[in-house]
Amino acid sequence: SWRKMATAEKQKHDGRVRIGHYILGDTLGVGTFGKVKVGKHELTGHKVAVKILNRQKIRSLDVVGKIRREIQNLKLFRHPHIIKLYQVISTPSDIFMVMEYVSGGELFDYICKNGRLDEKESRRLFQQILSGVDYCHRHMVVHRDLKPENVLLDAHMNAKIADFGLSNMMSDGEFLRTSCGSPNYAAPEVISGRLYAGPEVDIWSSGVILYALLCGTLPFDDDHVPTLFKKICDGIFYTPQYLNPSVISLLKHMLQVDPMKRATIKDIREHEWFKQDLPKYLFPEDPSYSSTMIDDEALKEVCEKFECSEEEVLSCLYNRNHQDPLAVAYHLIIDNRRIMNEAKDFYLATSPPDSFLDDHHLTRPHPERVPFLVAETPRARHTLDELNPQKSKHQGVRKAKWHLGIRSQSRPNDIMAEVCRAIKQLDYEWKVVNPYYLRVRRKNPVTSTYSKMSLQLYQVDSRTYLLDFRSIDDEITEAKSGTATPQRSGSVSNYRSCQRSDSDAEAQGKSSEVSLTSSVTSLDSSPVDLTPRPGSHTIEFFEMCANLIKILAQ
């Protein structure tokens, strides 16, 4: 949902503009609707790119009616080679789109500085770009301004397509009449003012990008614009001798003047040059994607995000109205799940770039990680235990014996909301240490002792978060670590139980003060020993983890 600023639309922070939790910095670029600035999280230092859309310009272009639902859908886009939209902040004068920031700069600048890429590297980047284009086309979004300036590179030289954000949703029979984009990359039908449907113009632009990767120059270029237009409309371009004949045939098919004869994504995917060394995760297969079965979880998520009824969504699906934003959102959710599953399998079997999923890190010692949204930015360290914001202030803290984790590319707030929902469903009690750090406990009905664990959300990289499960052995460890209140009663009464009222919870907190000590002493002087057997705490911890993971996976 769009977040409204409660006070002034722009707040000053030490002379700098602040939007939400982000301090705006240098301008990264200027577009049709406004500027793109780098933003830095005021607490963590995490960088984002903030696109500023001027409401007056949006009104003048008559796109107010569709931009809200379109942006809502774009927030669902999750693809390893498309810049992600994290958050939208709305003010009376502007709309701020908080997006993924990558450090490698534009592909355009890289080519200008380093010249053409070798064939293998060109193919690798082109495969990534086409995968992103295909993902958006299947969800009724056309870019219309693909060019090396809109392809960004991350720290590992992987492609990230930017600026899908303001493209129109495609509809059958609805042609995109707006001639936009850079002439050098524009298809003949665009510059000549003819009607065009959308996907085919992205294919042309992708062909120009492929040529630039392989040759270091543009296929159509001239300082005199009328001459440039003639070259594009003639479709004749120079092919250097060093080019592979196979890739020349692909380029000629993609840069076909007649859009009806131009290559489709299916044609490109089946081309022998493109298929070589193609990672499976870029085009995952899913036999259930076109299934007529309705996914209840996806249906529920669409209703929550769009504040609509199930009947509205089902009506779009049953009527096969695939262009409706509700239907697009539904298929996006299912598609995201499919892509993540396929990508996980791929990355477990290969050595992937660090920029996507990072599941291979699970087999190595913990790398440096930065906690998300904590009160301070700690020094770089090497274990999850040391990175706990409270524990880091204390020396000699014993490392937890166990840690488990779930990785996700969802937004941090969404992850924690799902975690709290699952905890509530399991009837566990929990205490909020900070919005991204919870302590959870479950009472053993036999021994009346509590099994306790902590849940901490960590940021692994700019796209991935790790929900860390840690066993809490005893109250003494908690008190020393600074994560619990020194008084037992204070610690207990701060736990939340969804089944009780506040007064009931307070009464339970007082009575539980005794039961907390029952793990080491009996409730009275009788010889009954309720001390858990060695290892039982570990077993109960794993049971808690398993129950929670099962709910989260539903």
Swiss-Prot record:
EC main group: transferase
Domain of life (superkingdom): Eukaryota
Gene Ontology process terms (BP): autophagy; cellular response to glucose starvation; cellular response to nutrient levels; cholesterol biosynthetic process; energy homeostasis; fatty acid biosynthetic process; fatty acid homeostasis; glucose homeostasis
Domain Protein kinase as annotated: residue spans: 22-274
Post-translational modification: Ubiquitinated. Dephosphorylated by protein phosphatase 2A and 2C (PP2A and PP2C). Phosphorylated by ULK1 and ULK2; leading to negatively regulate AMPK activity and suggesting the existence of a regulatory feedback loop between ULK1, ULK2 and AMPK. Dephosphorylated by PPM1A and PPM1B.
Pfam family, one: Pkinase
Subcellular location: Cytoplasm; Nucleus
Cofactor(s) of this protein: Mg(2+)
Domain characteristics, as noted in the entry: The AIS (autoinhibitory sequence) region shows some sequence similarity with the ubiquitin-associated domains and represses kinase activity.
Name this polypeptide is given: 5'-AMP-activated protein kinase catalytic subunit alpha-1
Organism from which the protein derives: Pongo abelii
Lineage: Eukaryota, Metazoa, Chordata, Craniata, Vertebrata
